[in-house]
A protein has these predicted regions:
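Conserved AMP-binding/adenylation subdomain of ANL enzymes
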Residues: 291-309, 319-362, 377-378
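Structural core segment of the AMP-binding/adenylate-forming
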Residues: 168-249, 368
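Conserved AMP-binding/adenylate-forming core of the ANL superfamily
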Residues: 42-47, 94, 110-164, 181-186, ...
Length: 660
């Protein structure tokens, strides 16, 4: 399996066939309205960023946004941070979901595949009924506008319904996946002072049953004012904890649906950053921002319609989950899977390919790392399963290697639209992605999304090509965060994105603009780790490792694997004397898995005499990583600032040996 970087795997759609796609039809409206003509996607992109007000007004009109009051402008202010979108409008995200479900009331809309409870299907009407019952239950518990509702739930229909029920009230949704340990959960939701949590009792991961009862008890003990509802999932007869409601009791009544109109910028959902420099940042996304951005993504960039059956493999803690349920905006059916896709084997009945075939799905979103594992394992999905209905694969979470892209076309389907993408929790969307109009080149991403003024900049703030630069966005996007929870003065917000160039969003990814006018992400330019698309902050590791008596110090690094894998390495220094390193490593991995999540478990533990720190105590993660990689970015280590400079060469040698 060998495919050269940049090899064209799928040609651009001929111009006279654009009207076979949702994007093509939308762009024809633009051409007719403004008297312009686009020969290719890049010309359309250039128009969209040069005419932001007109472009986003056309998105608003094209998708018939329901507003209970007129807006007075498209962009009242372009200042970043703080851009003011559609001032005066009064909308509700959930009302648009409701409209689509009413139009698809009698067809299967959620196709559920769970290793815990088996298979089920919900029609649009069943989902509407569940949303109404949950909304009634929330009201009965005193939940209203501005309250925070937490779901400690897997990717199942009830989670989807709870999100939209919460949104309908003007309450704020927050999801933490059940594989997260109690400390990871509390690091996130304690910031929010949530009013209510809905949690499962446990779940199955492959053949293993995992209870969440003790974890929920610990979470509730830390937040005694928070009300709790338990959904029996692992055990239908599970005991409901004292002071909590059963899901059945919570949803026993139903009242007619209503929607609280809110301002465009009003909070809809809180997603969490990785926690690189402390507790994870609580990133607030607004009703209007996600509504417009997700309509654009789902319909135009992804070319999804109500004729599609979409399968997004995602944990509920990933921003992809929040994006995935927005496919309901256009009436597309969703396949929900909760379980281990590698059980009982990579080519077994729970393989993502098997689920795709069995559910007759037309669209897949998965992790690039999953595609890499399948490719390197010699799987031939197109021969093993009937994937004749599959027409598109989106992948994200890490760069997709050229060889793996070639494998997709050779072994999955020769006519697919393969669309690697990269964006983030920060915008709950993409900065570079695919397009149904554009060619597919191995190891690269095709385009910048319409309306996204994305560039690669060098240190001098000028565009660069053919080499890594900082991914920047020089104009507002509707889905940029409204604010960070608890960051009243925008201090953390500004420091996160605007500390390098005032008024310019710096995302923290290295981005290459290629000679083919395509795009490639080569890794993070900050200390955030990336495990299969879920960004993990080093501060989360240190919060639980620092108190360990057997450890003197620790440092966690991430190295991108060019073949699509991800390597998380932990450098550990022993506190006193000798210890059984094999047993300690096993115990520490179990501890990390329990307290944080399986994604946090390091691939390799390296024992070192010390970790690189300055005299002020700062861990030198990025400088050490750059030194090992041989990258001269001006951040290589000045030995004079190190507490133990004599240990540095040995640490670098140990890292290089592991990475060799």
């Amino acid at each position: 399996m060998s495919t050269a970087l940049g090899t064209e795997l799928r040609p651009a759609l001929p111009r006279d066939q654009w009207n076979t796609t949702e994007m093509g039809r939308f762009l024809e409206k633009i051409e007719n309205t403004y008297g312009v003509h686009f020969e290719n996607y890049d010309q359309a992109w250039a128009w969209s960023v040069a005419n932001l007000d007109d472009f986003w007004q056309q998105i608003w009109d094209h998708f018939e946004i329901i507003s209970h009051a007129p807006h007075t402008a498209v962009l009242g202010s372009r200042t970043m941070p703080g851009a003011q979108w559609f001032p005066g409008a009064r909308i509700n995200f959930a009302e648009h979901i409701h409209r689509a479900l009413v139009e698809h009331a009698d067809v299967p809309i959620l196709i559920n595949r769970s290793q815990t409870t088996g298979s089920s299907e919900w029609t649009g009407q069943q989902l509407l009924d569940e949303i109404a019952a949950l909304r009634t239950g929330l009201i009965a518990q005193g939940i209203g506008e501005g309250d925070r509702v937490v779901g400690y739930l897997p990717n199942i229909p009830q989670t989807v319904a709870l999100y939209f029920a919460t949104a309908s009230l003007g309450a704020i949704w927050c999801s933490v996946p059940p594989e997260m340990g109690p400390q990871s959960v509390l690091d996130r939701i304690e910031q929010l002072d949530p009013s209510l949590i809905v949690a499962i009792d446990g779940y199955k991961w492959g053949a293993k049953s995992i209870s969440r009862a003790d974890e929920l008890d610990r979470i509730r003990a830390a937040l005694p004012a928070m009300k709790a509802v338990v959904l029996p999932y692992l055990d239908a007869e599970c005991e409901i904890p004292a002071g909590a409601l059963s899901y059945a009791e919570f949803t026993k009544n139903t009242a007619p649906m209503e929607f609280v109109p809110v301002a465009f910028e009003y909070p809809l959902v809180i997603l969490f950053s990785s926690g690189t420099t402390g507790k994870p940042k609580a990133i607030v996304h607004c009703h209007g921002g996600l509504l417009l951005e997700h309509y654009k993504d789902i319909s135009l960039q992804f070319d999804i319609t109500d004729r599609d059956r979409t399968f997004w493999y995602s944990t509920t803690g990933w921003m992809v989950w929040t994006l995935s349920v927005s496919s309901l905006l256009v009436g597309a059916a969703m396949v929900l899977m909760d379980g281990d896709p590698g059980w009982p084997a990579l080519d077994g009945e729970w393989s993502q390919w098997a689920v795709l075939a069995e559910t007759k799905s037309t669209y897949l979103t998965t992790g690039s790392a999953y595609l890499a594992v399948c490719a390197h394992s010699g799987l031939t999905p197109g021969k093993t399963w009937d994937l004749s209905r599959l027409r598109e694969i989106q992948c994200s979470g890490s760069p997709l290697a050229a060889d793996v892209a070639g494998w997709v076309y050779a072994e999955v389907g020769p006519d697919l639209m393969l669309a690697p993408a990269s964006g983030g929790t920060d915008i709950c969307s993409g900065f570079v992605c695919g397009s149904p109009l554009s060619p597919v080149n191995a190891g690269e991403m095709a385009v910048r999304p319409l309306g996204a003024a994305v560039y690669s900049w060098g240190p001098d703030g000028q565009e660069v090509s053919g080499e890594p630069g900082e991914l920047v966005c020089v104009a507002p996007l509707p889905s940029m965060p409204a604010f960070f929870w608890g960051d009243e003065n925008f201090d953390r917000y500004t420091a996160s994105y605007f500390d390098t160039w005032p008024g310019i969003w710096r995302h923290g990814d290295w981005l290459i603009h290629t000679e083919r006018n395509t795009w490639a992400i080569t890794g993070r330019s900050d200390a955030t780790l990336n495990r299969g698309g879920v960004r993990l902050g080093t501060a989360e590791f240190y919060a639980i490792l620092d108190p360990r008596p057997e450890l003197k110090d620790s440092l966690v690094l991430h190295f991108e694997d060019p073949d699509g894998g991800m390597g998380v390495l932990a450098l550990l220094a022993v506190a006193n004397g000798e210890l059984d390193k094999e047993a300690t490593e096993k115990a520490l991995k179990t501890f990390i898995r329990t307290e944080l999540s399986p994604r946090h478990v390091p691939d390799v533990i390296i024992w070192v005499p010390s970790v690189p720190r300055t005299a002020t105590g700062k861990r030198l993660e990025i400088p050490l990583k750059r030194l090992v990689q041989g990258i001269n970015t001006g951040n290589t280590i000045d030995r004079g600032v190190l507490v133990h400079p004599e240990d540095l060469d040995g640490i670098v040698a140990a890292l290089k040996a592991v990475l060799a």
